[in-house]
Amino acid sequence: MADGLTKSAARNIFYGGSLFFFLLFAALTAHSHWYMVNKSTDNEGLTESVVAGKHIWEKNMCINCHSIMGEGAYFAPELSNVWERYGGHQNPEAARAGLAAWIRAQPLGTQGRRQMPAYDFTDEEMSSLIDFLEWTDGIDDQDWPPHPAG
């Protein structure tokens, strides 16, 4: 009997271990995908307007300055809780009006403040973008961001 591993035993351990961990990786990937699609996505709230708002978010590259749930740039405020910060849970109409007014106003020359570009959104585009921001507020982000101001 050999004192150590033979080449064939080492090869079998390597291939067996590789196959085991590959299958484990594939199973965890499939489960993660299933969980995201069936459990963690608010499919009922995912309306055409929310999808259109996401397309506006992407088309105007908002993520180059803002972040949602920590993903994106940190040049401008976090927006995953902007609906809550504007009081959307208590007064949705006032929150919609406040967000639309803020996005449209963009005061120029404010000392010590970064400037957001002025976007010429139509009323429908603005409504869709706000619907998207409202939808992101409903994502279970496990209390991220920790600071209420984003």
Curated annotation (Swiss-Prot):
Primary subcellular site in the record, as a coarse category: membrane
One family name in Pfam for this protein: Cytochrom_C
SUPFAM superfamilies xref list: Cytochrome c (SSF46626)
PROSITE patterns per the UniProt record, alphabetical: CYTC
GO molecular function: electron transfer activity; heme binding; metal ion binding
Highest taxon of source: Bacteria
Gene Ontology CC: plasma membrane
Residues binding heme c: 62, 65-66
InterPro entries reported in the protein's UniProt record: Cyt_c-like_dom, Cyt_c-like_dom_sf
Keywords attached to this entry: Cell membrane, Electron transport, Heme, Iron, Membrane, Metal-binding, Respiratory chain, Signal-anchor, Transmembrane, Transmembrane helix, Transport
Membrane-topology descriptor: Single-pass membrane protein
Protein's cellular compartments: Cell membrane
Transmembrane segments: 13-29
Described purpose of this protein according to its UniProt entry: Component of the anaerobic respiratory chain that transforms nitrate to dinitrogen (denitrification).
Subunit field text: Heterodimer of cytochromes b (large subunit) and c (small subunit).
Name of this chain's protein: Nitric oxide reductase subunit C
